[in-house]
Amino acid sequence: MNIKELIVLSDLYAPKAYADFKETEWGVMFYDEKNKTMHDVNHACIIKDESFVPALQEIRAFYTEKGITPRIYLSGFQHRDHKSDLASCGFGVYRFGNFQHFLLLDSCTLAPADQLQIRELKSKNDITEKLLNNLYHTYLAEDSDTINRSRALLRRVVQSKDCRLFCGFFENEPACIAMLVKTPFGMDCFDLVETAEKFKGRGFASELIAYLVRLCDRPAFLFSENPAAIRIYEKAGFRRIKVSPEPCFYRAVYQERQRVNAFA
């Protein structure tokens, strides 16, 4: 496989590190029955397109039985090639984000800094209410369950042998966070990068990313749509790489009483 294929597969299979999963002949279904509304740990990926239709039926039955909304993270041209299949099975399709992938290729040129105390979080007790409020409180207005979902996710992450979660503390306050995931395809994936609203613009994210780059001992990648974050990643040595036909993700969600395709 070439590097682009490895990135795509690493992306699709990364949740194996922090979710329960069931592998099938056509792909994989991720789930977490203690965090049912967190999309990134409750979705299916169909790898073999030739089994797309039977996969839809299995996905719908599997998640419905668990009381979880059936959801599929689509890849390639699946949103287009299987548009009618998805609609006939009751799945609506929507676009998500405007993302670009980046591969770590060059040396880090971020200016050295020593403002933070960077710690690796290794137990559930490290996921404090102070940390959650600092990092995710800003999203509560649009999503009242953000902190609960994030608490459940981070507590799974710190118990995983394939994840490393780091927090940058400024004067003992959680200021920023980032995760490294070791994927089954020999790559490191940067994810869950977040800076507390009150600490933005002070170079803390740059310091944390530079720290993580030094830890990478395998090819590393990430995806982002945030211009400010992208500038940091490029200074850290990441370079854009096109791995998918469009700079966005497509998701399919089962709509129990509305068998329509939301994507036009």
Regions found by a protein language model. Give the residues of each.
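N-terminal charged segments
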Residues: M1-E65, Q78-H79, K83, D145-N148, ...
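Short amphipathic alpha-helix that is part of the acyltransferase structural core
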Residues: N2-S10, H43-D49, G97-Q100, S107-A152, ...
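A conserved beta-turn-beta hairpin within the catalytic core of GNAT-like acetyltransferases
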Residues: N35-V41, K182-F190, K200
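Acyl-donor-binding surface of acyltransferase catalytic domains
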Residues: S51-S123, P247-F249
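Conserved acetyl-CoA-binding loop-helix of GNAT-fold acetyltransferases
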Residues: F52-R60, T195-E197, G201-R214, K235
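Conserved hydrophobic beta-strand within the GNAT/NAT acetyltransferase core sheet
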Residues: I72, F190, A220-E225
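Conserved active-site alpha-helix within GNAT-family acetyltransferase domains
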Residues: H79-V93, S206, N226-V243, C248-Y250
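A conserved beta-strand-loop-helix scaffold within acyl/acetyltransferase catalytic domains
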Residues: D143-E194
